[in-house]
From Swiss-Prot:
It catalyses: D-glycero-beta-D-manno-heptose 7-phosphate + ATP = D-glycero-beta-D-manno-heptose 1,7-bisphosphate + ADP + H(+); D-glycero-beta-D-manno-heptose 1-phosphate + ATP + H(+) = ADP-D-glycero-beta-D-manno-heptose + diphosphate. One of its GO terms (biological process) is ADP-L-glycero-beta-D-manno-heptose biosynthetic process. GO terms for molecular function: ATP binding; heptose 7-phosphate kinase activity; heptose-1-phosphate adenylyltransferase activity; phosphotransferase activity, alcohol group as acceptor. In the N-terminal section; belongs to the carbohydrate kinase PfkB family. In the C-terminal section; belongs to the cytidylyltransferase family. Residues 345-476 are annotated as: Cytidylyltransferase. Keywords: ATP-binding, Carbohydrate metabolism, Kinase, Multifunctional enzyme, Nucleotide-binding, Nucleotidyltransferase, Transferase. This is Bifunctional protein HldE. InterPro entries: Bifunc_HldE (IPR023030), Carboh/pur_kinase_PfkB_CS (IPR002173), Cyt_trans-like (IPR004821), PfkB_dom (IPR011611), RfaE_dom_I (IPR011913), RfaE_dom_II (IPR011914), Ribokinase-like (IPR029056), Rossmann-like_a/b/a_fold (IPR014729). Pathway: Nucleotide-sugar biosynthesis; ADP-L-glycero-beta-D-manno-heptose biosynthesis; ADP-L-glycero-beta-D-manno-heptose from D-glycero-beta-D-manno-heptose 7-phosphate: step 1/4; Nucleotide-sugar biosynthesis; ADP-L-glycero-beta-D-manno-heptose biosynthesis; ADP-L-glycero-beta-D-manno-heptose from D-glycero-beta-D-manno-heptose 7-phosphate: step 3/4.
Amino acid sequence: MKITLPEYDKAQVLVVGDVMLDRYWHGPTARISPEAPVPVVKVEQIEERPGGAANVALNVAALGGKVNLIGLVGDDEAANVLVKNLKSVHVNTDFVSVPNFPTITKLRVLSRHQQLLRLDFEEGFEGIDSTDILEKMHASLTRQPSVVILSDYNKGSLADVQKMIQLAKKFNSVVLVDPKGSEFEKYRGATLLTPNLAEFEAVVGKCHSEKELVERGLALIKELDLDALLVTRSEHGMTLLREGQEPLHLPTQAQEVYDVTGAGDTVISVLASSLAAGSSFEQACTLANAAAGVVVGKIGTSTVNTIELANAVYSQQEIGFGVLSEEQLKLAVKLAQHRGEKVVMTNGCFDILHAGHVSYLNTAREQGNRLIVAVNSDQSVRNLKGQGRPVNPVDRRMAVLAGLGAVDWVIEFTEETPQRLIAEILPDLLVKGGDYLPEDIAGGKEVIANGGEVRVLQFEEGCSTSEIIKTIRNNS
């Protein structure tokens, strides 16, 4: 199965669930307290990170998706910290503030990357009326988020989870649930559940073989009227189950495991973002599995960005080639540059590909390790060359260019010049054929300002698209 990272900036996700604040106190330990047989930690660093459903939303935003977060908080300093931190990373918060209840906060004390103690500040929101959350959900769903995540830590925000599932389904949203506890009946009708193995076996019983896990998982799908079930299995990876389809077993991609805190949040957020951006279930689960392998190598609740995810998915393999969207190309370029590869970019109409074009593109590719060709849209060619051009529409021109061995990536631009696109991509080297001065080449100033270089290459004499068209017309 070929995996391509989707355009996460197109994903719209609504997260509803138990919001928390994770606090971390870091410091060295050099002695034992004279008051009790416990280590003394000299606190030198304090971190505050969104946790629980807030960490799920943070993970969606880290991939570039648009996310709205709904949950219960107290009227306190911890809630203000959460709102401020989430706003800074473009997470839209729509919290329900509950007087006389503290925002759920977990304080961890660490020394030399080892957790020594955790203190929980919470009363739990059990029994709180869900009307306000349901109203906020309805308002958010009218803005058409394509995927809804229900992040359940059994703290009370999802007390009426069945009503939430039915509300989301009225808007034809995909509903993903990260469950808690052994009462899975309340999640009936969701699109997909993501229990870990312990949670899954607490519901269906101990599974002694792969066959048993699959059979019981499929039975659970039927019983709860689900579309799919994704069982996360720690060092054994994860398994995607769907009725009438073969199970998909994905081995773990974790290289080192430092902390599993928040790994489940990362899985469901990448899964949701990928589905919202157009990935299939298989592709979305593969990406979520890769992301989990990255995040467990970090300390505490954390996120995975597109570069880390691309590295995990592609490793030392090719990121892919051919015709890409702008977001896909930006990711491909960042990953190539991250590996130390030199990215070259050029542009043109390339209406009827001829020997001069091929020679020029080969020379351009020799200047670096990767070659991008930006191609004028049909209207752009028409504006430059006049009526009757292009002879070949842009999809055919790009397909031919993508088939050349010298070319890695091809992209269309619709403006008169590719200046905006080049400024977004920022290749290491920008090349152009003809009698240009480097400072006059569109996008050149931006490339140079970024530390790149601009070069002018020579076209092969005697080759011209206009002359080819003239010859064809004269002979017809």
